[in-house]
């Protein structure tokens, strides 16, 4: 399984903000500290603010800070809002009905079980557990 850079960046930003509660950081500061482009940071901030994980304000005195309690930020829930596609293989897509092995393939259910186990395990953790 491969998680997108976008998901990675969301986790990194939340971990950093979680380790610095009540501090406000600009996009440029986060970019410099985390080694990420400002464009990527802006996209992540938009998504996190839209889902009420962080406070974000623009302007001269603007910046971002964590507003949710780290104990209330479930990692699986975060994964669900950041990953557009958790399909392990192409034919998990709703556009593709089945494997070409015509009923002989039992891979899809096995991989689906593995994905569900991954998500279930991740749901046991919060941001507080990883900061």
Identify the meaning behind each predicted range.
Residues 39:
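Key DNA-contact positions within bacterial/archaeal DNA-binding proteins
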Residues 1-13:
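Short alpha-helical segments that sit at the start of domains
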Residues 44-49:
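Basic amphipathic alpha-helical segments that dock to polyanions
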Residues 67-131:
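Non-DNA-binding regulatory cores of transcription-related proteins
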Residues 60-67:
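Minor-groove-contacting beta-hairpin "wing" of winged helix-turn-helix DNA-binding domains
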Residues 52:
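Glycine-centered, phosphate/nucleic-acid-interacting loop/turn motifs that mediate DNA/RNA or nucleotide
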Residues 18-22, 68-69:
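Short helix-capping/hinge SLiMs at alpha-helix to coil transitions
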Residues 28-34:
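A short alpha-helical element within helix-turn-helix/winged-helix DNA-binding domains
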């Amino acid at each position: 399984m491969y998680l997108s850079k976008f998901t990675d960046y969301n986790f990194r930003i939340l971990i950093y903000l979680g380790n610095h509660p009540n501090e406000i950081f600009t996009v440029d500061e986060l970019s410099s500290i985390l080694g990420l482009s400002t464009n990527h940071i802006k996209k992540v901030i938009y998504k996190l603010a839209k889902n009420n994980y962080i406070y974000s304000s623009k302007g001269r005195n603007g910046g971002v800070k964590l507003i949710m309690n780290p104990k209330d930020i479930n990692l699986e829930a975060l994964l669900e809002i950041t990953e557009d596609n958790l399909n392990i293989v192409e034919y998990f897509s709703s556009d593709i009905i089945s494997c070409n092995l015509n009923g002989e393939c039992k891979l899809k259910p096995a991989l689906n079980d593995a994905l569900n186990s991954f998500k279930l395990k991740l749901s046991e953790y919060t941001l507080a557990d990883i900061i």
